[in-house]
Amino acid sequence: MKTTLILSMLAGMISQSCIVSQDAIVPSENYLTQQVNVEAFDGIKTSTAIDVVYTQADRTAVEIYAPDNLMEYVKVESRDGLLNVYFESDETGKSLNIRGNHKTQVRVSAPAVHTLQASSAGDIVLANGLKTDGCVRIESSSSGDIEGADISCEELKIQASSAGDIELERVECSSLHAEASSSGDVSVSGVARSAKFEASSAGDIDADELKAEEVIAKASSAGDVSCHAVASLEASTSSAGNVRYKGNPKDIRIHSKGVQKID
């Protein structure tokens, strides 16, 4: 009797395993490229494991590069001014179950965008930088990554949370505000007139290669900030937060311990 019961249980487990395997999609090694027509957009958002490569250009062109058996599930559409990139659910309404590695990309050429958002392991790469007179907002969360160089704008707002990473090089802006929380990481270099850095909950901001005339730096709950102040620095820490700074600012206001100069 026990033997029969055990065999029945094993049969059920094997059957269930087969069902799971049948539901999973193994990415093909045959890649295709497909052009996509979209309405006008001012920002880009990727919310699944799809990489977006953005190139600033005079004209808009969007194409998908994906395994042939994943192509139909890659969705690119403009909503509320954002170009949304994601994997569509399967026929049952469940999240797509992809078993194996793949290099699905959405390649976007367009005039200057002002919002970049990456989440759920999605990545955004700025292929040739970003130049605009307005405000640029860059956000990453849930293991999303954003990286780029040669970024020029009036105001730059950066936010990384939940293990999101943002890496920007050779930034030029008038005002910069960077926030990192919940193990989010921000790395930024360049120049700015004023900069404000806020790190909390093990967030990390590495900005000692960004020279700013005026700097405000705050770190709390094991957050870390490194910065470079030219003329003035206001710094505060709490709950094991740390602020480190380069430069020789004449105006220094330190409101707590945990602030130190970098040689």
Model-derived segments and spans:
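A residue-level signal for conserved active-site and pocket-lining positions in enzyme catalytic cores
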Residues: 48, 76, 116, 142, ...
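Sec-dependent bacterial lipoprotein signal peptides
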Residues: 1-16
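Beta-strand-rich extracellular passenger or scaffold domains
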Residues: 119-127, 146-148, 166-168, 186, ...
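Structural signal for glycine-centered tight turns and loop->strand junctions in beta-sheet-rich domains
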Residues: 42, 58-60, 82, 122, ...
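A generic hydrophobic-segment detector
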Residues: 1, 141-143
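Acidic (Asp/Glu) and glycine-rich low-complexity loops/linkers
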Residues: 8, 18-120, 124-140, 150-160, ...
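Short, surface-exposed interaction patches in beta-rich subdomains
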Residues: 166-263
